């Protein structure tokens, strides 16, 4: 009985992640290979979702809740993991302070996502995010350009 429940949860998690991947693909075809490069692995010890660069690990309850409550947030979480891998954040830490590295990489990835003006990933930026991006741009640590319009 318990094995059947775990199998069902795994199928549902895979379906949620595949649906999220497909929605992102519709808007970002240039990320085709990157979006499709992960195996999906159920892992109740994970807090939400995460990746090691090859697999996306997910807590079934957290994944289902995120998908049900806010599809944009789900899309952003998936894209966040993909961008971490594309930018080699998973493999380039070397001797750097782990906490500082992770926060810096998260800010870099979220900045990219926040400045791609696509409905499927759009969330209103908080004042804190705007202030941080402004400070980093003034220090020339990130460059934020306005999107070009046809």
Which positions does each model-derived feature cover?
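Short secondary-structure capping/junction motifs at helix and strand boundaries
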Residues: 114-136
